[in-house]
Amino acid sequence: RPNPNTHYIDGPVLNLKHQSFVGMHPVPIVYGMTIGEYAKMINGEGWLKGGIRCKLDIIPIQNYTHNTAYKLPIRPSPNLPNAQAVALYPSLCLLEPTVVSVGRGTNQQFQIYGHPSFTKYQFSFTPQPNFGSKNPKHKGEVCYGKDLTQIEKPKRIELQWLLDAYSNFPDKDTFFLKGFERISGVSNLKKQLIKGTPEPEIRKSWSEELNKFKRLRSKYLIYP
């Protein structure tokens, strides 16, 4: 099937010491491949347990390229209600293991973010239990922040929202929750945020591993 986020490749490449159910292989957050292409890579690189290789049958998608716009016919998760949420998820997922709400407990999940302390912002929302989140972060509290529902579909991971949230949160020592390295896939992003590393330097620190991945990826592509 198509992948709605194959139009770019970005993010730190997973360090296997942070391997988990949410990140199993040494790929970036956005790897720019269909599930068939990704399966070819897993097989070809021997990433299955014990290095085994499976018999793989892939039915190619007709008239598809990595830049083909694709809107999922149904929501892939209760907390990814529409195409905008799917597009913003790779960027906003980095706020999940922090004190900041990404809209769980609203009907705009992964399209907004905020915290009760961000009172300089006019936009606000109040998370409440719903089908996708029985006990959302900051339940019943007014959160102030940013509304991203109308912004253009990103062409890279947007670090600006993570940097903005960290900069505006008053108690830096309590900003990160357990599992930030598991979501980001690396140890240094958290350290860079704490240090105040500028965004261009953060991106530069990804570049070598990201370029290696792009070369590896090219071996397994089915679509232009």
Report the location of each language-model feature.
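Glycine-rich, charge-decorated loop segments at or immediately adjacent to ligand/cofactor-binding or catalytic sites
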Residues: 2-16
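Mature-region segments of soluble proteins
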Residues: 9-13, 38, 103-108
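Conserved anion/nucleotide-ligand pocket segment
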Residues: 17-90
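Glycine-rich, aromatic-lined ligand/substrate-binding cores of catalytic
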Residues: 54, 62-139
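Conserved functional hotspot residues or short segments at active or partner-binding sites
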Residues: 108-207
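C-terminal regions of mature proteins
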Residues: 197-224
